[in-house]
C-alpha cells in the first residue's frame, strides 16, 4: 500500500499549482466575483503559527468559493514600510530595504510551503516605487481638496522610536509598538482631515452588517460623538474668550472655576507674569505623568491657578482659571467649565483647592445639602439656583437652555467628536516621502503628479535622532520649486505606514498599472472586498483609516462604493504556555518545523481544528499529533481500496443492505454539514470533526462488510476527497490523481448532497411511561400513532408498566417519541 509521505507529496503539488498558474485570477469573468483578502503582514521577521492561522482561514474560504463556481481574487502582499522593519534593521545593523526584502523572501517561501492559494502575480510591496508613487498621489488628492494640512500642535512623542505617534498608536499612555511611555512635544506636523468624515464614518457603521458587533462598537466609541453646546467665557481684563464644549449646558449656573489642559496654548496666553516661573515647574511635573492615567477618575487631581479670572456668562461672577492635569487637550476645546456639584472630578479638584461648590440640579427625592456633600450629584433632577429655569426638570430644560444661550449670544448648539485628525508625519527614514516642497517665494507647494514618485534615497544615515533622517541628506532636501523654478527644500518627514495600508486592497486589482493607481472599471467589478480577515487589534487603526480613504476617493469620483470591506472576520490568537507567541518569551512555534515533522496539511488542519477560528486557542503538541494520526488513518483507509475502485465508474449505485444505505447517508450528511459549517460562520473545527466522523464510518464499513460495494466506495472516496481539499489540499490532489483523474481538485466543483440519500428507512422511537423512558422501538419511518401503540403494547417490558392501569393520555411525536400517561 502506498505510504503517506507529506515531504514528497506537498512540494510536488505546489510545483504543479505554480507551473499551471491555477490560482492566477482573470481580470474579468462571466462567473460571479469573490474578493477574498487577509490583512498583509509587516515583513519584520519570520512567520509563526499564529500568523499562519490568518492565512489558512483565508485559504479555506478561497478554495471553497472557487469550487462553488466563483471568480476568486485571493492576493497577498507586504506592509513593508514603517517602524517594525526600520527598528529591526537598526538592531541588526543592516539597511531597512535589504532587511525587508530578505524577510519578504523568507515569508513568501513559508507561505508557499503551507500551500496557500494566492495569486502571486498580484503581489504588492508597499516600499517599492511602483506602489508608493500612488500613496503619494493619494496624499496630493487629499491636499488638493483641503483634506491634508500642516499645523503646529502638541503631539505624542515616543522617546524610544524617536518619532511622533497618532492617538490611535498610544495604548494606556505607551507606544503600541515598543511599550515606551509616551511624552508630549510641540511640532509642526502633517494631518489628514478625517474629522470632516466623522459623521459619515459613524453613520455608515450600521451599514456594515457583515462586521462583528464588537468592532463596530469600538469604532463608534473611538469616533465618540457628543451633542451639547459651545459656550464662550470672557476673560476678565483681557480681550479674549475661552470657548468650552459641554454636554451639560443645564449646569452652567453651577460653574465655579475653569480648567485648561496643560498642553493647551491658552495656558501661556493666560498666565500672569508673576506666576510664569511656578507654572513652568508645574507643567514640567505634569509632563512626566502618564497622560492617560492622570485623566482617570481615581488619579490625584493636580492644578495651578493662572492668576486670571473668567466671567460666568449667565451669572456675571468672576471664576478662577486653573491649569489642571485631568483635562485632555485632545477632547473638545481642551478647556472645561467646571461644575463641582455635578461632576466628580471637578468635585475632587474643588475640595482640594477650596473652590466653592454650588448645587444647580437638586435630587427630586431628597434635597441636597451642599455642606454635607461627599460626592458629586451627576444624575438628572430639578433645576435650582438657575435663574429662569428654576423648578424645571434638567433633561427637559436642556434644549431651552441652548436656545437661551443662542439668543443671548453666549453660546451655540454643537456636536463634538472624540476623533482627532489623523497625524501622518513621521520623523523616520523608512516610509513614503511626503510630496511637498517649501519655497521662500511660493510657500508650501505640492509636487506635480508628473514628478511622482518622490524617491526615497538609499544612502541615508537612518539611526533615530529625533530629527527626520531625510533632513540631513542635502541631495534629497535641495530641489527647485515646481511653481517658480527657484530654490526650494523638500519635506523631510515620511508618511505613517497606516497611509500605505489604507488603500492596498485597491492596488491588488491592477498591481502593475503604471499610469494610474487602479483601473476604474476593474475596481468597480472587484470591489468592495467580499471577505476581509484579520486581527481585531486593527479595529480603530487600519480599518477606520481604510474606510476614510475609500470615502474620500468615492467623493472625488474615483470609486463607486463607499465602504471597502463587505464582511469582516476577526480571528483569535494562538497562545503557547498561556502567552501570546513572541521571540522574547521563547514560546514561538515555527510553521517550518511543523511542516518538516508533520506536513503542511496536518498543520493547516490542526490550526483550524483547535477551536472555533474566532476564539483564542492554546497550542498543543499532542493536538497536532492527533490530527496527523487522523490524516494517516484516512490515507490508509483510502489507499487500502484505491486499486480496486480506480477504474470503477459511478453511474448507478445499488445499495444492497442497511449497512450500505447507512454509509451513503453518512457521506451525504457529511457533505451537507461541512457545506453548512463553512457557509454559516466559518465553523471549520466542526467541519473537520465531520470529516473525522466520516472516516470512522468508512473504517467501520471496511472492517465489517463481507462484500464491498465498489461503486459506493468510489463515490465516497471522490466526494470525501473534494470536501477534504480546502483543509488538506496536497493530500486531496494526490488521492484525486491516483483515482485516475487528469484534472486538479482545485478546478473541480464542490459536491452537492443527495436529498434522497439523507432519507432514513427506519427510526428509533423512544417510549415513555409518565415521562420516564421505558424502552425503544425500531420501526419504519412515519409510522402512525396506532401502529406505534400496537408495537409498544406487544413489547412485554413496556406492557408491564401499563397492565392494570388506566391510560389517561397518549402523546406521539412522529418518528421520535411516544409518551403514555397512566394512573
Curated annotation (Swiss-Prot):
Family matches, as InterPro entries: aa-tRNA-synth_I_CS, aa-tRNA-synth_Ia, Leu-tRNA-ligase, Leu_tRNA-synth_edit, M/V/L/I-tRNA-synth_anticd-bd, Methionyl/Leucyl_tRNA_Synth, Rossmann-like_a/b/a_fold, tRNAsynth_Ia_anticodon-bd
A Pfam family reported for this protein in Swiss-Prot or TrEMBL: tRNA-synt_1_2
Matching SUPFAM superfamilies: Anticodon-binding domain of a subclass of class I aminoacyl-tRNA synthetases, Nucleotidylyl transferase, ValRS/IleRS/LeuRS editing domain
Gene Ontology CC annotations of this record: cytosol
Superkingdom classification of source: Bacteria
Gene Ontology biological-process entries: leucyl-tRNA aminoacylation
Record EC number: 6.1.1.4
GO molecular function: aminoacyl-tRNA deacylase activity; ATP binding; leucine-tRNA ligase activity
UniProt cross-references to PROSITE patterns, sorted A to Z: AA_TRNA_LIGASE_I (PS00178)
Claim: Methyltransferase is one of the keywords in the record: no
Enzyme class: ligase
UniProt KW keywords: Aminoacyl-tRNA synthetase, ATP-binding, Cytoplasm, Ligase, Nucleotide-binding, Protein biosynthesis
Disulfide bridge partners, by residue number: none
Residue numbers covered by motif 'HIGH' region: 41-51
Localization, UniProt: Cytoplasm
Reactions it catalyzes: tRNA(Leu) + L-leucine + ATP = L-leucyl-tRNA(Leu) + AMP + diphosphate
Residue numbers binding ATP: 583
Short sequence motif 'KMSKS' region: positions: 580-584
Family named by the database record: Belongs to the class-I aminoacyl-tRNA synthetase family.
NCBIfam families the record matches: leuS_bact (TIGR00396)
Protein name in UniProt: Leucine--tRNA ligase
Protein source organism: Thermosipho melanesiensis (strain DSM 12029 / CIP 104789 / BI429)
Highest classification ranks of the organism: Bacteria, Thermotogati, Thermotogota, Thermotogae, Thermotogales
The encoding gene: leuS
